[in-house]
């Protein structure tokens, strides 16, 4: 299956796996998905990332994280900038997710980063997604 919006496909796979309480979720690999997965790992939303070589583009296996009483650590994922309607934010307009409790994933000229890092670097860019 070929997805037209690979980031939305990734977020949907993670959301569905969390709802079903799966331990892992497999996502077809790409550089942008790898960068988003690394941000989720650094921010503590997932436990780990494993790269599997399948002879084609590869697969990212994300190890999902739950609290002690089996509640999802990721309570929400939302795609913001879509192929049909791109959303950009200047360095002074970078949104805060839930008053700073969540993260915004931003694609900048210096790479893909969180909203906090983009503010610190003084760069704006395309607002890819919100995670909370």
From Swiss-Prot:
It comes from the Bacteria. Part of the 30S ribosomal subunit. Contacts proteins S5 and S12. The gene is rpsH. Belongs to the universal ribosomal protein uS8 family. One of the primary rRNA binding proteins, it binds directly to 16S rRNA central domain where it helps coordinate assembly of the platform of the 30S subunit. Gene3D superfamilies: 3.30.1370.30, 3.30.1490.10. One of its GO terms (cellular component) is ribonucleoprotein complex. This is Small ribosomal subunit protein uS8. GO terms for biological process: translation. GO terms for molecular function: rRNA binding; structural constituent of ribosome. Keywords: Ribonucleoprotein, Ribosomal protein, RNA-binding, rRNA-binding. PROSITE patterns: RIBOSOMAL_S8. It comes from Acetivibrio thermocellus (strain ATCC 27405 / DSM 1237 / JCM 9322 / NBRC 103400 / NCIMB 10682 / NRRL B-4536 / VPI 7372) (Clostridium thermocellum). The keyword rRNA-binding applies.
